[in-house]
């Protein structure tokens, strides 16, 4: 943080709270008197700038527990690293800029990737395996914007490609790249449907068969698939 913003890092004024149905004491509210477990379930985890605290879903039947059971505890670490990314934004003034939500979410994904990259390179107190990194990416994809949604809609987090791309930028290039994403954001993958037919196909390209003429193949898919694969693997 000092290298990126020229100031010392200030620890959270609040804390990191685990939310679960049986929790005996109330969770602090974010603009409300208290935070309910249902509120936390909706977001899986969130950072509250008003109280400078983080809450995450620690319920045994919650999505985070399900992902951790399937893919490992690395999912929890990367989700919390994303929320700490928002805490960084609070301290650096990014959250005061009234940016589109997806812009701040991209930077938070990038900071999570930078933290995971450090762990994967054994540069900190925590070490990550490839499986841990993969688990974190899966967790991000679980809360991606659905196909057809404009990423600039209120609350947009980015399509799956957007989230993975931001994570990768941080993982490979480090936190300095993340700091630049406000002025130099990553391009977003088109996520909206072009027309009604596109919506009916859920954004998938036509397979390339003309059902009106049996046996006659339309080369739409094959027309762009082969050049794309050659470009990727070339």
Regions found by a protein language model. Give the residues of each.
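Short, structured motif recognition centered on aromatic/hydrophobic residues
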Residues: 1-4, 79, 106-116, 164-167, ...
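Short helix/loop segments within enzyme catalytic domains
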Residues: 5, 103-105, 109-146, 223
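Catalytic zinc-binding patch centered on the HExxH motif and its immediate surroundings
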Residues: 18-55
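Active-site-proximal beta-strand/loop segments in catalytic clefts of secreted hydrolases
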Residues: 20-21, 57-60, 79-82, 90-93
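Structural recognition of the beta-strand scaffold that forms the well-ordered cores
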Residues: 53-57, 87-89, 109-110, 114
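Short pre-active-site segment immediately N-terminal to the catalytic Zn-binding motif
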Residues: 60-78, 96-100
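Catalytic Zn2+-binding segment of zinc metalloproteases
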Residues: 83-99, 114-121
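Pan-zinc metallopeptidase signature
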Residues: 145-232
């Amino acid at each position: 943080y000092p290298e990126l913003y020229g100031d010392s890092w200030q620890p959270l004024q609040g804390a990191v709270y685990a939310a679960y149905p049986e929790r005996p004491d109330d969770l602090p509210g974010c603009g409300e008197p208290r935070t309910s477990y249902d509120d936390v379930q909706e977001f899986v985890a969130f950072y509250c700038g008003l109280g400078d605290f983080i809450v995450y879903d620690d319920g045994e039947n919650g999505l985070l527990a399900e992902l951790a059971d399937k893919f490992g505890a690395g999912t929890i670490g990367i989700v919390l690293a994303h929320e700490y990314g928002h805490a960084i934004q609070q301290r650096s003034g990014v959250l005061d800029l009234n940016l589109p939500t997806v812009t701040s979410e991209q930077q938070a994904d990038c900071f999570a990737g930078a933290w995971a990259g450090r762990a994967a390179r054994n540069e900190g107190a925590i070490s990550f395996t490839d499986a841990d990194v993969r688990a974190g990416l899966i967790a991000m994809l679980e809360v991606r914007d659905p196909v057809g949604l404009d990423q600039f809609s209120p609350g947009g987090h980015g399509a799956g490609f957007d989230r993975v791309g931001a994570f990768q930028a941080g993982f490979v290039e480090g936190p300095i790249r993340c700091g630049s994403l406000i002025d130099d954001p990553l391009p977003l993958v088109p996520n909206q449907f072009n027309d009604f037919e596109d919506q009916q196909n859920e954004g998938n390209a036509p397979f390339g068969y003309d059902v009106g003429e049996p046996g006659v193949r339309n080369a739409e898919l094959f027309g762009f698939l082969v050049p794309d694969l050659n470009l990727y693997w070339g």
